[in-house]
Amino acid sequence: MTLWVLGLNHQTAPVDLRERAAFAGDALPRALESLRALPQVSEAALLSTCNRTELYAMADEAHSLVNWLETHAPGLSGHLYQHREAEAVRHLFRVATGLDSMVLGEPQILGQVKDAWAVARAHGALGSGLDRLFQQTFSVAKRARTDTRVGANPVSVASTAVRLAQDSFARLNESTVLLIGAGETIELAAKHLSEGRVRRLLIANRTLAHAQTLASQHGGFALPLTDLERHLAEADVVFSATAAREPLVTRAQVEQALRTRKRKPMLLFDLAVPRDIEASVGELGDAYLYTVDDLERAVEDNRRGRREAADQAEAIIDLQVARYVETLQATARQAPLKRLRAFGDSTRDELLAKARQQLHNGKPADEVLEQLAHALTNRLLHPPTAALRNAALNNDLELTTAADRLFPEKPGYQHPPIATPIVRTDDADPAP
């Protein structure tokens, strides 16, 4: 099986395509079950955020994975990137560290990667290969953030949106802000808004208790989602980030809110994928709509400022990828030896048990030992003998040369011992 990653993100696909590719809520476990049903796939995990959808899999080939994604959301293939083996490892390390994010070094992505791992594990989609990869990913991301400043003064999509709102409304502290949702992105927005203070903070969510908890933490007022339309006109600024499959805020609702506000401008930030606010709202004269794609341009300065720290993090990742691949290769080299030893042990145990039974039945010991020796020799030498016979017929010089080294003609000759590979398990840099 080969390690593959296939995906699309904010760099390769626009928001309308990303929202079609997203897996939200109950769709994620069902998708994992569907993936694991493919005969070419032994392990799988799905990472789905507002900026990316990625499929990690141990699979025979990538074609079946592309077809599966195309079935989920037709039209993706022209926007997909694909990595295998070492490059797939590097990609996941970079994603979890925040080096592949719209906001360079953003801290939320590591939690989202952990969530993807936890869901895949809970639904039986992970095996030892992907589980080991994700565990190493968490370790590498932690080290990169600890040893560099790539995560210093963390900037998120939510904080970038709040900063834009502050720049747009000189007196945001005199404005009413409406938050739709109660997930991590909205929690971050509420935190940044409460630090800068706003006149009134409204929080609407499908589960009222979640909105009430968030409101109590940040001095806001909780609303059931069913009251959203009634309170929309009160909002000068709207932030929305839910997992809804259909828009929660329509053009007609915003038009009505603007009439009620006597055309006083509204600023709306749609931080969700799929989108929470109908795209046509941005066509209204007094409504200013920003999506996650629009925010990419706003965070470019942040990306430049973190480039030096990112370069340091890339160096850490390069080293850790090399070590991880070295460990996998060492394990793979040991596999044939383990199979050979297991074959020898099982053959010995089987024939020895048979010989003991013969002795127990009164058969002469010399006869039993003679039969045991012949049977053991024949059983152990049959596979290599058959393989060498086929190699001679097919002119397989590689195998016959290896046999010459294993079984030299000169009696008593011994090859030098084969050194056991040293597999590094610590994170320390190699000694100079």
UniProtKB/Swiss-Prot annotation:
Substrate binds at T49, C50, N51, R52, S101, E106, P107, Q108, Q112. It comes from the Bacteria. Pathway: Porphyrin-containing compound metabolism; protoporphyrin-IX biosynthesis; 5-aminolevulinate from L-glutamyl-tRNA(Glu): step 1/2. Gene3D superfamilies: Glutamyl-tRNA reductase, N-terminal domain, NAD(P)-binding Rossmann-like Domain. GO terms for biological process: protoporphyrinogen IX biosynthetic process from glutamate. It catalyses: (S)-4-amino-5-oxopentanoate + tRNA(Glu) + NADP(+) = L-glutamyl-tRNA(Glu) + NADPH + H(+). SUPFAM superfamilies: Glutamyl tRNA-reductase catalytic, N-terminal domain, Glutamyl tRNA-reductase dimerization domain, NAD(P)-binding Rossmann-fold domains. The active site is at C50 (nucleophile). The record marks H91 as: Important for activity. One of its GO terms (molecular function) is glutamyl-tRNA reductase activity. NADP(+) binds at G181, A182, G183, E184, T185, I186. Keywords: NADP, Oxidoreductase, Porphyrin biosynthesis. Coiled coil: none annotated. Residues 409-432 are annotated as: Disordered. InterPro entries: 4pyrrol_synth_GluRdtase (IPR000343), 4pyrrol_synth_GluRdtase_dimer (IPR015896), 4pyrrol_synth_GluRdtase_N (IPR015895), GluRdtase_CS (IPR018214), GluRdtase_dimer_dom_sf (IPR036453), GluRdtase_N_sf (IPR036343), NAD(P)-bd_dom_sf (IPR036291), Shikm_DH/Glu-tRNA_Rdtase (IPR006151). It holds the Pfam family Shikimate_DH. Possesses an unusual extended V-shaped dimeric structure with each monomer consisting of three distinct domains arranged along a curved 'spinal' alpha-helix. The N-terminal catalytic domain specifically recognizes the glutamate moiety of the substrate. The second domain is the NADPH-binding domain, and the third C-terminal domain is responsible for dimerization. Catalyzes the NADPH-dependent reduction of glutamyl-tRNA(Glu) to glutamate 1-semialdehyde (GSA). Belongs to the glutamyl-tRNA reductase family. HAMAP family: Glu_tRNA_reductase (MF_00087). During catalysis, the active site Cys acts as a nucleophile attacking the alpha-carbonyl group of tRNA-bound glutamate with the formation of a thioester intermediate between enzyme and glutamate, and the concomitant release of tRNA(Glu). The thioester intermediate is finally reduced by direct hydride transfer from NADPH, to form the product GSA. Homodimer. This is Glutamyl-tRNA reductase. It comes from Xanthomonas euvesicatoria pv. vesicatoria (strain 85-10) (Xanthomonas campestris pv. vesicatoria). The lineage of its organism: Bacteria, Pseudomonadati, Pseudomonadota, Gammaproteobacteria, Lysobacterales.
